[in-house]
UniProtKB/Swiss-Prot annotation:
Keywords annotated in UniProt: Chaperone, Cytoplasm
Keyword Transmembrane helix attached: no
Subcellular location: Cytoplasm
Source organism per UniProt: Thermoanaerobacter brockii
Listed Pfam families: Cpn10
A single BP term in Gene Ontology: chaperone cofactor-dependent protein refolding
Name of the protein in its database record: Co-chaperonin GroES
Annotated Gene Ontology cellular component terms: cytoplasm
Length: 94
């Protein structure tokens, strides 16, 4: 099954934070911070602004940083994804 986002939406595969600290301490699930990085796996077709179609800036394969509590969490085939609006993406990691 695939996710095909609509409009200005983007599907991001969440990159989980490290489970072990630099000092070797293993973090329980409740102590880990909510992830804010991911890889773009699908993008929508863009949105219309003042009657003109505006393409999205992000593309498949981009590694991005997004707002901490943005988007809708989706679990598909055992993988975690976020369905975000492009405006929820703060930066592309180059």
């Amino acid at each position: 099954m695939r996710l095909k986002p609509l409009g200005d939406r983007v599907v991001v595969k969440v990159i989980q934070a490290e489970e072990v600290t630099k000092g070797g301490v293993i973090l329980p699930g409740t102590a880990k911070e909510k992830p804010q990085q991911g890889e773009v796996v699908a993008v929508g077709t863009g949105e219309y602004i003042d009657g003109k179609k505006v393409e999205l800036e992000v593309k498949v394969g981009d590694r991005v940083i997004f707002s901490k509590y943005a988007g809708t969490e989706v679990k598909l085939d055992g993988e975690e994804y976020l369905l975000l609006r492009e405006s929820d993406i703060l930066a592309i990691i180059e």
